[in-house]
Amino acid sequence: MQELRFVLIVVGALAIAALLFHGLWTSKKEGKAKFGNKPLGKLDVDQEDKDTPGQERDFAPDPEDDFEIIRKDRKEPDFGMENSFDNKFSSDPLIDDVLEAKEDKEQREEQEIPAFVATKTDDEQVEPVLQEPAKAFAEKEEAAEVVEETLQPVFEAPLAAQAPEVEVAPVVVDPVVEEPKPEPEMQVIVLNVHCAGDEPFVGTQLFDSMQQNGLIYGEMNIFHRHVDLSGNGKVLFSVANMMQPGTLEHGDPAEFSTKGISFFMTLPCYGEADQNFNLMLRIAQQIADDMGGNVLDDQRNLMTPDRLASYRRQIVEFNAANA
């Protein structure tokens, strides 16, 4: 720790000595530069001051720095040229003539200036002069109006002759009435559910199965399948009594009986006809299973795959013909 302190003291002393040496060297160098840059006039004045120390000087005190000496304007010696030039110009007769002509011109201009000052008499003389063009202009306007009155009937006649009224006959356009497309002939697809033996369907069991499959009793005293299972919306297909009179009207379901029921849908129908047919076929098969009956075609023959294919082909042909 003592050695480090000693080293720091030595380094600080060396740094201070270096700064002092650099300051002395810089001040000495600047003093030489100032002496070398002094003008000759400054050196002469300093020499005279040394020769006559006791005499008073009339010029101003020395400036604070050398830059003020440099900024002062140096007076160059004229070597006696000013007096010679003045004498030459003063004795030249050409210059005297030019100066005299210039003075005469200035005097003439001063004399001519009052001619431009307007007086009351001048205004009185100018007014009649201005009134004459106004009268002439008014006379010209009156003459122009007279010419217009004389020319006006000349131009009216040709214009009336050149602009005959052209009557445009209204164009009658017969409205194009599009012929309404003929409504397609309605077709009916029929499926039947018939009892398997001689025992008929009892109303209690039959109506319960129909209601469970989304059929609702409604108009014409038959059951319908609507778009909405709550009984709202369009009817997709309907179910009627296979026997006369064709209705499923009943007071007490237990007292109602029938040999079979008929499912039917019309073409065209609401929605997709092929989907409606598939739904009707599925419900008919479900009720036949519940009641132990059979699914028959429109001719009351057992349903076969070929007969189902013919039903679907009928739907496709109907849609193609009425597309």
Swiss-Prot record:
Protein name, entry field: Cell division protein ZipA
Coiled-coil region(s): none
Cell location: Cell inner membrane
Membrane topology: Single-pass type I membrane protein
PANTHER family given in the database record: CELL DIVISION PROTEIN ZIPA
Topological domains annotated Periplasmic: 1-5
GO cellular component: cell division site; plasma membrane
Keyword Magnesium: no
Function statement: Essential cell division protein that stabilizes the FtsZ protofilaments by cross-linking them and that serves as a cytoplasmic membrane anchor for the Z ring. Also required for the recruitment to the septal ring of downstream cell division proteins.
GO annotation, biological process: division septum assembly; FtsZ-dependent cytokinesis
Subunit structure of this chain's protein: Interacts with FtsZ via their C-terminal domains.
Name of one Pfam family that matches: ZipA_C
Name of the gene: zipA
Side of membrane Cytoplasmic, spans: 27-323
The keyword Cell cycle belongs to this UniProt entry's keyword annotation: yes
Residues covered by region (Disordered): 35-92
Compositional bias annotation for Basic and acidic residues: 41-60, 68-78
Residues that span the membrane, as ranges: 6-26
Similarity annotation: Belongs to the ZipA family.
Keywords: Cell cycle, Cell division, Cell inner membrane, Cell membrane, Membrane, Transmembrane, Transmembrane helix
